[in-house]
């Protein structure tokens, strides 16, 4: 390989199998974009992924552990995170509990396929 190219002499009947395993990347926006401050987006290949709530009380209660591995499985990305759980009161003097959970991200282009869960592309992180 040289300069990003691979050169190979082949003769017929040669079969070439290519397997590209795209890596998951964390994307950070400029800090001047206030709505995305302290948040990341996930991409794999050419796709951007959106976080699903999966029964969590709110998309805002979920936080991604950006230091843990992110696994590609069945077309989705799975990652460790936390879900903030509080009581029924809107305000309290006790902090909410941060319960470990698995976060599920689906390709953004599939986000409107039948589910009514809340979704977010830009997700809070533990950083």
Regions found by a protein language model. Name each.
Residues 1-9, 26-32:
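Solvent-exposed beta-strand/loop surfaces of large extracellular or lumenal domains
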Residues 15, 19-127:
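C-terminal beta-rich recognition modules with glycine/proline-rich loops and embedded aromatic residues
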